[in-house]
Amino acid sequence: MVMQSARRRRLLVALVAFVVSAGATIMAADSSPTTPSDVPESAPLVAVSNAPQQGTEKLHIGVAYGDTLTWKSDLGLASGLDDAVALGAKWVRVDLSWRDIQPDNPKNFNWPRFDRVVKAAHERGLAVLPTIGFTPAWAQRSGCARDDSSCAPADVDKFAAFAKDAAKRYAPLGIHTWEIWNEPNIPFWAPKPDPAAYTELLKATSKAIRGADPQAYLLMGGLAAVGTDPAKGYVSHTEFLTEVAKLGGNRLVDAVAYHPYTYPYLPSAKTDFGTAFEDISSAKDNLMAVLEKYGTPGMPIWLTETGAATNGPGQASDGKTIPPNTTHVTEGFQAEIATDTVPAAAANPHVAAVFWFEDQDSGTDKDKGQRSKFYGLRRYDGTPKPAFAALRTSIAAYARQQQH
């Protein structure tokens, strides 16, 4: 998540029995290896195709959950997905962590937890967008912290092999759309962003997934909307896309995923400096211009995260004023942003999908130093913020428009 120039660092934490927030990254291996062609270990899954098709409504609308669904109790998983249904969303974006599936070595697979998420989503008619990434310690590049799943893989072919296994497993269940990595232009590609290395990963992974699933629809990993800042390890979204496109990476995917957090401005705001939403196609330096320059004009943009935090270490903006050291917004202004997000996305012909991050806060006031815990439509205790009803109303209004 981004508030113009600031950026949260979401780190996965240790496994606990049941968690509401982002959960563990390491789980015990199955007693026997599981191959992608095996029958799922969990209960039978129902196929719900999620490949974008002609004739569907213009804008795909979803909720982004990160890795939280994977580690929820059965009740928590059901509740989280029921929220997506209640909102009127048709998609859920969920982390598919390589570290969780193959924590110890490349031979053993731990699929049941993700199977469980897929099954629960499909029972509700929700399409699943997996974000594939998160390197296990045994596979990460040397010189990167062993407890950091954001580390780049030492061997992109090993990552591609995992992606192929995942595609073989889930394509028969209707999952065809994949986001390859998360925010590779900031230190979620650790130890620092590397467009050339990411392009090599794209080459290997796109070939592997498409070989396993001819219907695959691939998204370049969601670019964080940031300015270039070497001290923070940030490469701007447009600069990173440019460097990847110079190497042909844009031709390996079907769409570009992007995370345009605009707060403390509305997504529809018109400015002279260019908000993250304006950077899609109307700002002087924009994503569509890069794609056109490098041979993929009109490539769709998927907004796989957007939203606003309602707590943080600094001041809150109510949308009318922007105090010094603004780090988040009031719940009232979050609701205004939720109201504005879908129509702002729908108004841009280049945008094919928008996902709100996220369903529920993972922290209380004592955690306000970690803004990343407060993007939810619900508070930590489960009570809805005004943004929940606002987003539901906005999605319903969009659906009515599509019927006429």
Language-model-derived ranges and their functions:
Residues 88, 164, 168-176, 240-255, ...:
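Structural recognition of alpha->loop->beta junctions
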